[in-house]
């Protein structure tokens, strides 16, 4: 290479760089590195979408021009001098010549495949490209994995024996097919829930296991149930094939199979797509990983964008090793780290960096910003979930009074059931809010079902609620029979319940009369128990005797487990109601209280409201002020992660995602004790809080000396005898030496758990007794109100004023003086 060629290549690179001078150096490098495999490790808030857009634009304008020493056109001193002059004084009229001189095999739009994870992201990519480049950008293949695969299959699925005009079955279609198969095989849906079967089949397809391989695997292991599921899987595939239909898993599976089995088809697409870009690569599963490799031709021009520290969808099949092993899969791969953050303050980033640094399975990067230090992260230790909710809502109200908008605030939690106490506090204070990616607690179907049971028990004349739950769970009382009973009730001017109780009197109800009367007897038995039992315990009986809990337990899929948690969480609402010292602490009083707050749900300004969501739902979003609640061991990280390194690292990544949603302030809360799913347990701070450096946070209400809780392993997953009890496991506290921030508290199963012991009897207290509380200090008991197997006590504390506490829950923290 002579001097002129060196000058030209250097000038060409600098001229192209001028188009992207507004990008930071690493972003610019990600745009201009066009050839070969490239891993873009894009930290939270680092502007990865901007890099993707500009990278595609660069490929269409200049092709390999920024990343090659090739000179495809004859050059002279004039061409080199022109580019050097353009660099010194770029003029718009010079651009056409500059682009001609700098372009080396510019890509045509249809030669670029950009894979995103959502249709919205694909649409945004095309829209921004069109604004930048004009209509030619619309021919870029910007699509989700499924959409891209459908286009491939519409052209070539006949090679697999399908007609190109295949049908795509959605989840409801697949459910109907499974239900028909269960009938054909004589299998009960209770034993083989449809959702579970579809989940198992989906997993098998994701692992590229055919029905025959699946059956053989589980026959060898002697698993009768899985072998039966294998037969369902086989018939399911047959029925879809007969209907010339694919489900969502088939779309990618058949594309991979096609590309693996047909060299001509594979070569066609490898030649067609000169450049492949895949966003959110950390969330890809095994099939998507295989597909990416099959589409990448000999040129090896695959660019994957992702953040291993934000891989949080393992439960959906995402495999973090896809991004961690990218450089091993593509030997000559280059890696560029996007570490400059444009969203958060340095204190927030330092805290998040410190937390995620404890993970071993990561590539490693450190986020930084020019936004300034900002406020330290606030950690607040509250007494219980009600205090936590009141603190968060109070803080948000304070910001609002100082001029902030409601919409500037977001509250994140690990699981949907945690929204209950927060919603109660928002409604009580008339603060507008919305739930994203979920349904408000009292609007959830299972919660409405249980409230309907309580309403009918309280008022059997409530025909509306009665019709809702008479056949939930199924009692084989058909809709036609209910309509007949309703007609009789209307003719006689009596409530529907009166007819149901004596259904055998009416010949037209003969087919369902016995089952109707059984239901009526159930309601009457529960009505008699209502006055005998404390309200929380009574609710537990309703859940058991109605068969509702058993119904959810038998389904035993992810959705049913979530619904079961919500049914359990309603017990927490009842306890919170009782602790609020209501005028009418009866079932009727609770139902009135619920009705009042649910009626306040409608908001006049749906846009300007506080956002509540799970941490998973928050991915990709950002807010000025973020509150991360439930930072307790056993809640976050959850108990399922204890002792499982991969699960624990996934939880830590989820914490990192939650923390990096915040722009200006980040507040994280934990409690000393939490009632969740109807059970109250003492809590210790999440290990993730302990991993935040002292210089980046302020901890309000932190107990000194620090207490560590040791738990037994006897978590009571059944509900027999569990209602209204203080804890599912016993605990003890032990003094722990103060440790430095640089060396976080070490957590192991051995130090957190202790052997189970019998539940301690209730402390005997009377009005006038002096007590000391570990959080509230010294105080005097004002009143003691027995409540079933518990008691509600009112204590006037010297420092914090009057508090109402359930004695079972508070007993561990109280000492009688």
Predicted regions located by residue number:
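P-loop NTPase Walker
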Residues: 1-164, 168, 267, 321, ...
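Conserved helicase/translocase P-loop NTPase motor core
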Residues: 22, 86-97, 145-149, 227-275, ...
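Conserved helicase C-terminal RecA-like lobe
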Residues: 218-222, 405, 419-431, 444, ...
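Conserved helicase motor core of SF1/SF2 NTP-dependent helicases
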Residues: 282-361, 365-370, 487-490, 498, ...
């Amino acid at each position: 290479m002579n001097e002129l060629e060196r000058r030209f290549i250097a000038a060409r690179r600098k001229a192209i760089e001028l188009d992207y001078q507004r990008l930071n150096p690493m972003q610019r490098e990600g745009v201009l590195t066009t050839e070969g495999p490239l891993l873009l490790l894009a930290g939270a808030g680092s502007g990865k979408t901007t890099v993707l857009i500009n990278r595609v634009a660069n490929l269409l304008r200049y092709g390999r021009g920024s990343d090659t020493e090739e000179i495809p056109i004859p050059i002279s001193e004039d061409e080199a001098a022109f580019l050097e002059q353009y660099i010194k004084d770029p003029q718009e009229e010079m651009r056409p010549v500059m682009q001609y001189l700098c372009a080396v095999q510019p890509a045509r739009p249809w030669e670029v495949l950009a894979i995103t994870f959502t249709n919205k992201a694909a649409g945004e990519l095309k829209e921004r490209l069109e604004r930048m480049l004009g209509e030619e950008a619309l021919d870029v293949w910007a699509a989700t994995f499924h959409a891209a695969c459908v286009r491939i299959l519409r052209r070539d699925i006949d090679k697999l024996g399908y007609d190109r005009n295949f049908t795509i079955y959605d989840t409801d279609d697949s459910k109907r097919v499974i239900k028909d198969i269960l009938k054909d095989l004589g299998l009960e849906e209770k034993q083989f829930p449809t959702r579970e079967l579809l989940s198992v089949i989906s997993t098998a397809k994701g692992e590229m296991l055919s029905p025959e391989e699946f059956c053989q695997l589980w026959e060898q292991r002697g698993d009768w149930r899985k072998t039966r599921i294998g037969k369902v899987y086989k018939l399911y595939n047959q029925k879809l094939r007969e209907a010339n239909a694919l489900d969502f898993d088939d779309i990618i599976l058949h594309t991979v199979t096609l590309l693996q089995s047909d060299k001509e088809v594979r070569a066609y697409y490898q030649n067609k797509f000169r450049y492949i870009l895949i966003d959110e690569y950390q969330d890809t599963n095994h099939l998507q990983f295989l597909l990416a490799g099959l589409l990448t031709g000999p040129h090896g021009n695959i660019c994957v964008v992702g953040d291993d520290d934000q891989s949080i969808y393992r439960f959906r099949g995402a495999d973090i090793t896809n991004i961690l092993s990218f450089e091993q899969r593509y030997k000559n791969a280059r890696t560029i780290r996007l570490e400059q953050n444009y969203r958060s303050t340095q204190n927030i980033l330092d805290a998040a960096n410190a937390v995620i640094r404890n993970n071993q399975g990561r590539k490693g990067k450190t986020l930084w910003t020019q936004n300034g230090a900002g406020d330290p992260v606030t950690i607040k230790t509250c007494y219980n979930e009600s205090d936590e909710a009141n603190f968060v809502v109070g803080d948000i109200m304070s910001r609002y009074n100082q001029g902030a908008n409601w919409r500037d605030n977001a509250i994140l939690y690990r699981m949907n059931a945690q929204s209950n106490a927060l919603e109660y506090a928002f409604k009580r204070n008339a603060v507008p809010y919305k739930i994203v990616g979920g349904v408000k607690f009292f609007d959830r179907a299972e919660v409405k079902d249980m409230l309907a049971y309580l309403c009918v028990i309280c008022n059997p004349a409530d025909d509306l609620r009665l019709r809702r739950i008479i056949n939930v769970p199924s009692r084989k009382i058909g809709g036609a029979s209910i309509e007949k009973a309703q007609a009789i009730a209307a003719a006689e001017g009596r409530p529907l319940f009166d007819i149901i109780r004596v259904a055998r009197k009416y010949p037209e109800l003969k087919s369902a009369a016995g089952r109707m009367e059984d239901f009526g007897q159930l309601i009457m038995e529960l009505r008699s128990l209502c006055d005998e039992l404390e309200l929380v315990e009574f609710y537990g009986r309703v859940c058991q005797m109605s068969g509702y809990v058993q119904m959810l337990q038998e389904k035993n899929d992810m959705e049913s487990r979530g619904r079961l948690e919500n049914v359990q969480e309603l017990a927490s609402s009842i306890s919170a109601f009782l602790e609020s010292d209501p005028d009418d602490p009866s079932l009727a009083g609770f139902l009135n209280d619920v009705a009042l707050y649910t009626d306040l749900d409608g908001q006049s300004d749906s846009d300007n409201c506080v956002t509540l969501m799970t941490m998973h739902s928050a991915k990709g979003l950002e807010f000025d002020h973020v509150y991360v609640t439930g930072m307790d061991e056993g809640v976050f990280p959850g108990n399922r992660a204890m002792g499982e390194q991969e699960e624990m690292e996934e939880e830590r990544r989820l914490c990192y995602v939650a923390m990096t949603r915040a722009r200006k302030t980040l507040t994280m809360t934990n409690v000393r004790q939490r009632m969740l799913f109807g059970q109250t347990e003492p809590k210790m701070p999440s290990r993730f809080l302990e991993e935040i450096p002292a210089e980046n946070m302020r901890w309000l209400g932190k107990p000194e000396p620090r207490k560590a809780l040791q738990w037994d392993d006897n978590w009571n997953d059944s509900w027999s005898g569990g209602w209204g009890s203080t804890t599912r496991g016993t605990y003890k506290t032990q003094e722990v030496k103060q440790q430095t921030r640089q060396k976080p508290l070490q957590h192991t199963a051995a130090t957190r758990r202790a052997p189970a012991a019998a539940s301690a009897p209730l402390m005997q207290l009377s009005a006038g007794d002096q007590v000391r509380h570990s959080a509230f200090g010294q105080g005097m008991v004002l009143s003691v109100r027995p409540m079933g197997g518990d008691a509600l006590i009112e204590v006037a504390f010297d420092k914090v004023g009057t508090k109402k506490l359930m004695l079972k829950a508070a007993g561990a923290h109280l000492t009688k003086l």
